[in-house]
């Protein structure tokens, strides 16, 4: 009997092409599954999932596959969104997409796959998995502009055992071409960007609904003079340049640190200012796809779009954290962000960055 693959369909072109490829090129029975993680709609309907679900219906109809919907709104709020708010209120810059992958897409969704009798879960992530003969390892996607292994570095290894990433070896251009050729209803749909529960709204206007504004000083760290005011230190992240609204300087201003107790945002002038660069950090909440003891040197990404940085991993007596020492200074290392570790194409694992918020 042919095995069953459940496709996580978002209503976008990527997951639509995944369903199409599995339906037309494999013997699997294909089922579509739409996951709803957010209930609230703002007055403009910017966070509405209705249009996405309609697109899933249209593509499933084109492919003649059954489809279902599941709501994890309650669990998402508890496991992802509540933590997002807690971390931001403390001054950290969390990555909810990494947490969503670990807690929702590759945990709760996996349980739903089993309920539907599925043998595999397929998603539209631009990642690859090594063959079973080599052991199950997460690899970068072939298209460096779309590689999403960074967002899966916190996902438990066992959660990937039955996962398929059909797009991992393709470029986005190729995926679009397949959608056009197949005349899929989502072929022309634009990619979604940003944090899913914020939608197209300005980040600040969304966050202030949940974390109260508290005005404070913006201080030039070098002169220790007050140069401006802010509405909440939690709105600012290390390395940020936009939104400071500070004039009177030939050099651009960058956020270099925060004092959450005193509600102060510190800035420096010039992108080459030494306080913007650090050579070490601590990584906590670690997740490994390989034995961590075997890792001494590797490369790391300290944010999604950053370049790989060569580094040394210094293990401690605490299994829950490691010290990371970079070969060269790295700009704007941000507490709360995700760090992903690599050995060439292989993702070794990841963790959460812990560094001082105050300049030093």
Curated annotation (Swiss-Prot):
Enzyme class: transferase
Residues covered by region (Interaction with target base in tRNA): 95-97
Main location: cytoplasm
Disulfide cross-links: 100-196
SUPFAM superfamilies: Adenine nucleotide alpha hydrolases-like
Record EC number: 2.8.1.13
Residue ranges of the region described as Interaction with tRNA: 146-148, 303-304
Catalytic residue list: 100 (nucleophile), 196 (cysteine persulfide intermediate)
Binding sites annotated in the UniProt record for ATP: 8-15, 35, 124
Catalyzed reaction equations: S-sulfanyl-L-cysteinyl-[protein] + uridine(34) in tRNA + AH2 + ATP = 2-thiouridine(34) in tRNA + L-cysteinyl-[protein] + A + AMP + diphosphate + H(+)
Its job: Catalyzes the 2-thiolation of uridine at the wobble position (U34) of tRNA, leading to the formation of s(2)U34.
GO MF annotation terms: ATP binding; tRNA binding; tRNA-uridine 2-sulfurtransferase activity
One cellular-component annotation, GO: cytoplasm
Superkingdom field: Bacteria
Protein name: tRNA-specific 2-thiouridylase MnmA
Presence of the UniProt keyword tRNA processing in the record: yes
Organism for this UniProt entry: Chlamydia caviae (strain ATCC VR-813 / DSM 19441 / 03DC25 / GPIC)
Similarity remark: Belongs to the MnmA/TRMU family.
Keywords in alphabetical order: ATP-binding, Cytoplasm, Disulfide bond, Nucleotide-binding, RNA-binding, Transferase, tRNA processing, tRNA-binding
